[in-house]
Amino acid sequence: MKVKWETYNPDWIIQIAKEQIPEETEIIQNLKHCIKCFKRSKAYYYFVYSENPNEPNSEWQFDENIILHSKEKGEIVLDILLDKKIGGIEFLNKL
């Protein structure tokens, strides 16, 4: 899959995470590293290359989802990988 990475500003989602999941300090810290993204669609942005997900040697090793709520953007799903890295973000109101 050929991807085009774009600059991304995660400040807005960091603020929401600090308010809604303050106990998840590692996830909040890792959101700060989400400064480039690949927009698969209006509803989903990747922060980690996702080819061959969950296969050996793939960077994408899924662990869990965390759902956050934004007044402006609605429900947001964070894809959290095994090392608490942020794999991607999904905007449910854009599906």
Question: Model-predicted segments: where are they?
Answer:
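Short, compact, well-ordered microdomains
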Residues: 61-95
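N-terminal domain-onset segments
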Residues: 1-63, 73
